[in-house]
Amino acid sequence: DVIGPQAQVTLANQD
């Protein structure tokens, strides 16, 4: 799914 990669980016943003 396209949301797959997007979810990972969100987690990285929490840095």
Curated annotation (Swiss-Prot):
Class in the EC hierarchy, top level: oxidoreductase
Swiss-Prot/TrEMBL catalytic activity: 4 hydroquinone + O2 = 4 benzosemiquinone + 2 H2O
Main localisation: secreted
Activity sensitivity to pH: Optimum pH is 5.2 with ABTS as substrate. Optimum pH is 6.8 with hydroquinone as substrate.
Superkingdom per UniProt: Eukaryota
Role played: Lignin degradation and detoxification of lignin-derived products. Active against a variety of substrates including the benzenediols hydroquinone and catechol, the benzenetriol pyrogallol, the methoxy-substituted phenol 2-methylcatechol, the aromatic diamine N,N-dimethyl-1,4-phenylenediamine and the nonphenolic heterocyclic compound ABTS. Shows highest degradative activity towards hydroquinone with lower activity against ABTS and N,N-dimethyl-1,4-phenylenediamine. Activity towards pyrogallol, catechol and 2-methyl-catechol is considerably attenuated. Shows no activity against tyrosine.
Name this protein carries in UniProt: Laccase
